[in-house]
Amino acid sequence: TESPLAPAQRRQLRAIGHQLRPVVTVAGGGLSDGVRAELERALEDHELIKLRLAVGDREMRDALLAQLLQEHRAALVQRTGNVALLLRRNPQPDPRKSNLLRRLG
């Protein structure tokens, strides 16, 4: 999945993301309403999040990730194995919760 981020921007986001822990895990139950709601909340609050895809094989994870990116209007910053770093900017971020504002100042 290609994202509309400049290489320098992507590098900076990966550096921030390196310190983050996955906040949402998609497991055997797949994309339940609870997972979707939690992902939406996490993107709204934190803007930059890690997502763990603990399901199926690579093709299944690719399909799930593509679906999530489209549904939640998020950009893929990086994908390593079953962990993805997602970005969706919030027009009015909370400085106490946003991983971007807290790390970039």
What name fits each language-model region?
Residues 1-105:
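Positively charged, polar, low-complexity stretches
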